[in-house]
Amino acid sequence: MQNTVLRLRTSTCHVTRQRLLFFVSGVALSALVLQKDTAEAQETNASTVLQPIVVQGTAATKGARVEQRGYVATQSASATKITTAISETPQSVSVVTRGAMTDRAVQTVADSLLYSANVNGQRYGNDPRSDYFSIRGFGADLYLDGLRVPQIANQTGGYAGFRVEPYFLNRVEVLRGPSSALFGQTNVGGVVNMISKDPSETAGGEVYTRFGSYKQKEAGFDVTGPLGADSDLTYRLEGIIRDSETMNDFGKNDRFAISPTVRWSPDEDTSLTVYGAYMKDDAGQVPSLIPAVGSIYPNRLGLTIPRSFSDGDPSLAIYDKETAYTGYRLEHAFNDDLVLRQNFRYSYLDVNYQNLFGNGLSANQRTLSRLVYNAQPTLNAVALDTNLEYRFDSGPISHTLLGGIDVQWQNLVNRTGSRSGPTLDLFNPGYGIGVQPAALTTHLDQTQRQVGFYLQDQMELGGLRLTVGGRQDYVSNDSDSTALASGLTTRYRQDDSAFTGRVGAAYVFDNGLVPYALYSTSFSPVLTLTPTPLKPTKGELKEVGVKFAPQGDDFSLTLSGFEATQQNVVNRVASVYYQTDEVRVRGIELEANATLWDSLNLTAAASWQDPVVTESQTPAQIGKMPYTVPKQQQSLFVSYDLPMPDSWNGKLTLGAGVRRIGRTAGDTANSFFVPGYTLVDAFARYEHDRYSFQLNGYNLGDKTYVAGCNTPTQCYYGQGLTVVGTVSVKW
């Protein structure tokens, strides 16, 4: 139902950035002061390094939070909300450990996923505003410690997207396939669940400096330990500051981020973790939108658009973003069989986005038309999840029952305006022309509320593992769109509800072989930057596979075949979102991780899939490939600790990786295709006592390639050769 009223509604929830920053800074200052007392109270050794976390809390979840140097993880909490052996989980799960992230010197969450099976980690190149990635050809959902990170249009990325700092993370887990039966809002492709570093009972710390390509200068720190001798309080304080340019002229990749965490553990059955984070980003001119002609295909003039080309202007190159979140995680075990958990987080985002970008190419194939765009989004979000875990036996069957309720609330206020801008010569650009910002013309106020009730039973009978779960969701979406010139408001109201379920079975053989099968459904309401609400996405997954973990912590392999179908798939062209009726993806995936001889780590992945539009209101799109979805991907990353003479008193580690992304469709009509590409990365690290010296290189061949396209005039170059050096000191 739609009506028009003369009223402008503002956000119903507002917490000032100054108060959030005051909160974060206060906790940080307290932790730093108490660190001095802790250091004096403990006997230290100069050769001691930052120890792996001694996890406090209940056994139900601590296994998935332990820091790991190797590449093989054995447990995950993403698939079931309870720490479960990955090999016994009837679903494809990957874990990128802290050790793997350190070896690759990842600077974004998307970077950490570049070697995971069937994850396209840079579908639009390297964008300092947000992380863009997809799983199995569908937009992925982003979670932090089991709670959903606010997202626009059910996709990571976008100019109003959160970008969590990877230095604050212990691991990144990839759950392929929907998890709506537990988490609620998830796409059929899967979930990326980021696990934060926890405070440690052992005092330690790290400081580092980093220099690299594009004039990058960065420094960071991570300190942790108990808050006083014999204290039941522990803390962790992390922070980074970066000043950097980007591949594109007038682009920036500046960041300041800080994250304090305090944990109270009065006994072995109870823990309360209170945390916060504040991040401020300055991206300047956003990555360039370039035409396919002159980048993928030859220009009739015989000219190629350089990678450093900017479609903007330094007089209007503004992208400033502030994000913050704070919350708590509570666990209490009443006894060995009954555990209560509650997870709460409040999130805030504010963006000032004023840019000039390309949106068309003239017939002469060198004159670029441009759009002046102005957006001022503010997002407030609250998430609360409460559940009970109960373990019991019914005859020969062991049960782990999980039931709970979660509540999610999001309010997005976005003021936008746009107009045609001055044209630009692709091959002889003139900059510094004094472009004025576009006037704001529209005020959008959207509020989304969701309540979900879920129940899951994990059953064991001998080697059989059976997981059955279901969830009922109720969602409302209120949207007011006001024309600022007239004051007229158009109001939309949308209510939805859905039941989603999951049934999975696996059989654990003594030799480590685990065949499994899974059926799961998904449901996800959509919050957008446009006035008219989009339909919720719905999907289903059928998956069979086999896992092999013969040596416990040393080796793991997963081979899976799947068919994923999703209705109302959300797509994006520039800042406009629209939906495709139905997309189906059938595929095969293989991923292996190994830690051998305590010196060799490797991760290998390969995927082959057939993505196709099966239903559309535009008949010509049926049978076509969705854009930015590769049919195949392969990758391999290996690191090796070289034997060193005892006299060196150090360790030398060398590593290298190769990743291949197959060709993708460049638009919905499949009128052209983006060629596939192969990239090589490498690193070397020397560790001596408390000191570490590391050098990383990405795209060592300096290959020029296009990462993806939405239309013939909206393509994105991939990152060129990038070199980064890091020096760190641990204690």
PLM-predicted stretches and their roles:
Residues 242-246, 258-333, 348-379, 422-450:
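Acidic/polar loop-and-plug regions of large Gram-negative outer-membrane beta-barrel proteins
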Residues 282-295, 411-414, 502-548, 553-580, ...:
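Surface-exposed extracellular loop regions of Gram-negative outer-membrane beta-barrel proteins
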Residues 331-333, 337-345, 349-355, 536-598, ...:
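Membrane-embedded beta-barrel scaffold of Gram-negative outer-membrane proteins
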Residues 263-267, 379, 398-402, 406-408, ...:
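Structural signature of Gram-negative outer-membrane beta-barrels, strongest in the C-terminal barrel
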Residues 151, 167-170, 181-258, 266-270, ...:
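Outer-membrane beta-barrel translocator/receptor signature
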Residues 2, 659-667, 685-731:
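C-terminal beta-signal and adjacent terminal beta-strands/loops
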Residues 563, 580-668, 701, 726-730:
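Gram-negative outer-membrane beta-barrel transporters
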Residues 51-202, 544:
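Acidic, small-polar-rich N-terminal luminal/periplasmic segments of exported/outer-membrane proteins
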